[in-house]
Design a protein with these regions (language model features):
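Short glycine- and Lys/Arg-enriched binding-loop motifs that mark or flank ligand-binding interfaces
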Residues: 1-5, 58-61
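Short glycine-rich, Thr/Ser-proximal phosphate-binding strand/loop in the N-terminal lobe
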Residues: 2-46
Length: 101
């Protein structure tokens, strides 16, 4: 399973994909008002609540802000994101943050 997201100042869109076949299959997705939450970890916990499928292998999140050595201070939210902390939060071996340009 792969978790992907677009982290914006207004909304955060999250999607969970099954990667066990040749093509990715959307399992579920959701959108959350970013400013109603104190952190991305809070949103991810809410999104994953009740998930009983296979464990997550990886996560990837597009963010507004420079990503330096796996860390990002978002430009339009008071959030500090770190790949390692996010990986621990979702129980995945790998997480990447990407600047969304």
């Amino acid at each position: 399973m792969i978790l992907a997201g677009d982290i914006g100042g207004t909304k955060t869109a999250i999607a969970l994909f099954d990667d066990s076949a040749d093509e990715l299959r959307l399992v579920r997705d959701g959108t959350f008002p970013s400013k109603d939450h104190g952190s991305l970890e809070e949103i991810l916990a809410r999104f994953l609540q009740g998930h009983e499928g296979p464990s997550l292998r990886a996560g990837c999140f597009g963010v507004a802000g420079a990503v330096i050595e796996g860390k990002c201070q978002t430009t339009n939210l008071p959030w500090h994101l770190e790949e390692e902390a996010l990986a621990r939060a979702i129980g995945a071996a790998h997480v990447r943050l990407l600047n969304d340009l």
